[in-house]
């Protein structure tokens, strides 16, 4: 993280800066980095990846910064992240997350084909969206939803993800 982030800070606008920033964010998955260094980098260069956004949210919260909740909700809704970070973020945000936040996360997880995280997320989705999410998860996992006894919701035919998965898109 330090190598990439230091280079980006020293040479802002360097060609392919976005790739360097993404590599810095990916390094957070492998390295322990001081919270103040994480927040200093992301304060100047907002996260480009959802795992980076999630790490930023946790660092903000640990430092008691007011924007932690807003960044955390955006990360929650944004899709996949490291399992340990997911658990920490959920513990931090559970009191403020709304059904729409959980449904948005599930949609992002399904689009990213993050099956294991999507299966965990099923516990939190709204009852009205659950069947549609189960159908989409089945399609991602290569299972026929009808064989599992799941009805195909009429509004699902208009959703681009399931239509594409069925080969009709």
How would you name each of these model-derived features?
Residues 1-169:
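Alpha-helical solenoid repeat scaffolds
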């Amino acid at each position: 993280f330090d190598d990439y982030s230091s280079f980006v800070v020293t040479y802002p606008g360097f060609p392919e800066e976005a790739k360097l920033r993404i590599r810095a964010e990916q390094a957070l998955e492998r390295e322990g980095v001081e919270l103040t260094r994480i927040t200093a980098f992301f304060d100047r260069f907002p996260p480009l990846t959802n795992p980076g956004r999630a790490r930023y949210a946790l660092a903000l919260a640990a430092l008691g910064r007011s924007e932690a909740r807003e960044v955390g909700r955006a990360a929650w809704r944004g899709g996949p992240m490291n399992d340990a970070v997911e658990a920490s973020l959920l513990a931090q945000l559970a009191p403020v997350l709304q059904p729409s936040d959980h449904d948005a996360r599930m949609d992002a997880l399904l689009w990213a084909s993050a099956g294991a995280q999507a299966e965990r997320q099923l516990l939190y989705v709204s009852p009205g969206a659950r069947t549609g999410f189960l159908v989409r998860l089945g399609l991602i996992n290569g299972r026929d939803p009808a064989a599992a006894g799941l009805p195909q919701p009429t509004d699902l035919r208009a959703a681009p993800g399931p239509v594409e998965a069925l080969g009709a898109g």
